[in-house]
């Protein structure tokens, strides 16, 4: 057990694997975690061990030995091999099969239906907690809001249709666990290491219990103070009591991430939980002093200037984290757009607006002044221009124009662009989706104005990396600086609130900013 940033994954598990490798070999050593990203980190850590390198095992050797719990259960059960994993394309088929699924078919759902669709979230949470749909609905916090636009009657009907749709054709994560937990197949395991054990759901714990019966050594690695997936079946009380007994070398104490200021503040947040379960943790900070500053809002707080200056003038990373979507939509993203910062969600590789698109807006004035641009760059202008500025709405056919640099006047003479364009330096006003007199800006107009703001604020070459994500999204991450929003939209268990705040704050290495509530309800820290 160890608090955030004490090397549970990169140091302790590495040491344990090395020890058991000498004792048992690698053939029947299993290391499990919850996500593919975490599994890759573990794989990279373990395969960097000198003795493991000397084994010269193929990469595939570790695919079934260092992986997610779902992957292991899928590969070690009697689940029919002809079943395909239910994915995005299967979801599209399902929507045609039963139209009620399409009732929540927005852009976020279409991108990742298994995580974002209310039905699949509810189904996963019910299964993770070991409850049927009716009991899960009764025990959920404001389910009508959480699983909007569906009510229990709809979800039950959808469950029946979903099960019928995937019968003998598809399998999902719940099926993988169910087949494994009901299997009579013998397992041969020398040692089993479970990372982030505190996040295990009810069926995952049953799966680990089954594995443990066949293992010579079982090690659970984690931190009960970071148990924040109760809605999906995690049991903080069980792991608080389990890990409270851990002492000696199995208790990690040296902090490798958080500065003194963040470490001190984080311990104040979590101390009431330590007191309740009657244990104390030794958790040292790094040598850096760091700071924790408070923001009353994201408009005019005194400490906000410090944050903006650091975001604008450093090459460090900044993480905005929060409890609800209201925080994201109503003040965090509006602040980032207003200040003209480039940003992205923690799950995305690319910024909200990519550099290629930004370049179109930034280089347009110089193109008008006669600076030659490549054919590819001019095509980017042409694709986005409103049709009234195109003398020829179609882009030149391949081979009909030489691939070289051209000036604005060259394309006017060739009959593709209008001379009228010279009157407008701001490309965003020429965009095909720009609405000058609209009472309420649509998505594209807001985006165009945001791009213009980046250029106005001279943030095109921004060095800092700015990300956002809710407390559950950011768990497991490390960033240089963290901004923690305390706003709540509903009442929650006091210890749950402390764990959420603790997880959010301890993502930071150097400095933290605490944003006071903007809703009237505030996270207890």
Label for each model-derived stretch:
Residues 1-525:
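The feature marks helicase ATPase cores and/or their adjacent C-terminal helical subdomains
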């Amino acid at each position: 057990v160890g608090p955030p940033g004490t090397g549970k994954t990169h140091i302790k598990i590495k040491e344990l694997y090395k020890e058991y490798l000498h004792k048992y070999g690698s053939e029947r050593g299993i290391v499990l975690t919850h996500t593919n990203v975490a599994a890759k980190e573990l794989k990279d850590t373990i395969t960097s061990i000198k003795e493991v390198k000397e084994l010269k095992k193929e990469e595939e050797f570790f695919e079934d030995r260092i992986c997610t719990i779902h992957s292991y259960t899928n590969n070690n059960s009697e689940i029919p091999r002809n079943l395909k994993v239910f994915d995005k394309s299967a979801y599209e088929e399902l929507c045609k099969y039963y139209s009620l699924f399409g009732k929540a078919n927005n852009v976020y759902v279409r991108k990742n239906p298994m995580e974002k669709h209310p039905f699949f979230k509810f189904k996963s949470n019910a299964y993770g907690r070991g409850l049927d749909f009716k009991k899960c609905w009764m025990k959920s916090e404001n389910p009508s809001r959480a699983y909007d636009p569906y009510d229990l009657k709809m979800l039950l009907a959808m469950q029946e249709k979903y099960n019928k749709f995937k019968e003998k054709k598809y399998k999902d994560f719940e099926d993988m666990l169910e087949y494994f937990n009901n299997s009579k197949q013998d397992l041969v395991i020398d040692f089993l290491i479970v990372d982030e054990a505190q996040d295990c759901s009810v069926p995952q714990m049953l799966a680990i219990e089954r594995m443990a019966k066949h293992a010579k050594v079982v090690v659970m690695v984690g931190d009960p103070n970071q148990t924040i997936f109760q809605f999906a079946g995690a049991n903080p009380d069980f792991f608080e009591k389990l890990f409270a007994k851990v002492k000696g070398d199995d208790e990690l104490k040296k902090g490798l991430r958080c500065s003194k200021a963040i470490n001190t503040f984080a311990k104040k947040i979590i101390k009431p939980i330590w007191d309740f379960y009657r244990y104390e943790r030794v958790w040292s900070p790094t040598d850096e002093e760091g700071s924790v500053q408070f923001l009353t809002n994201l408009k005019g707080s005194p400490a906000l200037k410090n944050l903006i200056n650091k975001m604008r003038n450093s090459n460090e990373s900044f993480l905005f984290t929060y409890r609800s979507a209201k925080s994201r939509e109503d003040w965090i993203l509006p602040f980032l757009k207003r200040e003209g910062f480039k940003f992205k969600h923690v799950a995305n590789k690319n910024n909200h607006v990519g550099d290629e698109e930004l370049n179109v807006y930034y280089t347009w004035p110089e193109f008008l002044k006669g600076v030659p641009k490549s054919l590819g760059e001019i095509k980017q202008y042409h694709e986005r221009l409103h049709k009234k500025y195109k003398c020829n709405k179609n882009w030149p056919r391949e081979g009909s124009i030489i691939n070289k640099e051209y000036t604005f006047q060259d394309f006017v003479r060739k009959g593709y662009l209008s001379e009228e364009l010279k009157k407008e330096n701001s490309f965003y006003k020429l965009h095909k989706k720009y609405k000058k007199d609209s009472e309420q800006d649509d998505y594209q107009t807001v985006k165009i104005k945001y791009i213009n703001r980046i250029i106005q604020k001279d943030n095109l070459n921004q060095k800092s990396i700015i990300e956002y994500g809710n407390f559950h999204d950011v768990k497991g991450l490390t960033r240089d600086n963290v901004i923690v929003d305390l706003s709540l939209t509903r009442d929650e268990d006091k210890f749950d609130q402390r764990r959420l705040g603790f997880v959010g704050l301890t993502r930071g290495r150097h400095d933290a900013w605490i944003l006071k509530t903007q809703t009237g309800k505030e996270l207890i820290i």
